[in-house]
A protein has these predicted regions:
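Glycine-rich, proline-tolerant flexible connector loops at the mouths of alpha/beta enzymes
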Residues: 3, 7, 35-47, 98-99, ...
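Alpha-helical scaffold segments that flank or form the walls of functional sites
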Residues: 15-30
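Generic structural signal for well-ordered alpha-helices
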Residues: 20-23, 51-55, 77, 112-115, ...
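Conserved SAM/AdoMet-binding glycine-rich loop
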Residues: 29-115, 120-121, 133-134, 198-201
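Auxiliary Fe-S-binding modules of radical SAM enzymes
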Residues: 60-61, 148-224
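Catalytic cores of alpha/beta
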Residues: 73-82, 133-148, 204-216
Length: 224
């Protein structure tokens, strides 16, 4: 984010050797899929072609591939689909009502439209949200009801980890008790029962010592 002053490593692309090494790890350990995350909201056609070539090489091993990649044009989405990309992650992040409080570069409706376009091209969809950004309980319910309409194949729930140098570095985390976090996951399970409910960021902090309890509600957890 242009608003972030966090101390992070910056680089264009992860080295091909690392990418293919991770893909080999996924295959050797019989993991369900390999998800590749890219920062940024939009990409050029030339950048998409570079990514498509990487996807072709990884897909040759039969890996189920997912990308978290921001907004795509229909042409770009078709290029990646033809290369073998199976799933795209595009989170709603919060409710329609609360979204302007966390993002000023685009609208909630633009995110929904991007997801609908991808579904129309035959992509599996991974879409969820982030809990702990100052939203109300009603906002959590509203976000999940929107996801109920979308019917993603996977629904990841992230619990905010405040990072120094970011706009939410001083966010009030007192609401995120283990019990509250579990209630959010249970609600996701009840409202979107066909989706794979996944616990993502924050599980090590908010479920510390209780992570086994997660598997009574969620289908999977994110690693690495």
């Amino acid at each position: 984010s242009c608003r972030s002053k966090a101390d992070i490593d910056k680089y264009k692309w992860v080295a091909d050797e690392k990418l293919y090494e991770d893909n080999d790890f996924v295959k050797e350990h019989h993991l369900s899929r390999h998800c590749i995350g890219l920062s940024g909201m939009k990409f050029t056609d030339a950048e998409i072609e570079v990514l498509a070539e990487k996807i072709r090489k990884m897909k040759a091993d039969g890996t189920h591939l997912c990308c978290s990649i921001g907004f795509l044009t229909e042409h770009q989405a078709k290029v990646l689909k033809d290369a073998g990309l199976d799933r795209i992650n595009h989170n709603l992040n919060s409710s329609r009502n609360y979204y302007p409080n966390i993002c000023s570069t685009h609208t909630f409706d633009q995110r929904v439209a991007n997801i609908r376009m991808l579904q129309g091209l035959g992509y599996e969809i991974c879409s969820g949200g982030i809990i702990g950004m100052g939203e109300s309980k009603e906002d959590v319910v509203d976000m999940l009801m929107e996801l109920r309409e979308i019917q993603p194949e996977a629904l990841p729930i992230n619990f905010l980890l405040p990072i120094p140098g970011t706009p939410l570095e001083h966010a009030d985390m007192s609401v995120l008790s283990t019990a509250y976090c579990m209630k959010v996951l249970c609600l996701a399970r009840l409202l979107v029962p066909k989706a794979d409910i996944r616990c993502a960021a924050g599980r090590e902090v908010y479920f510390k010592g209780e992570e086994n309890m997660l598997l009574r509600v969620v289908d999977s957890i994110f690693a690495s």
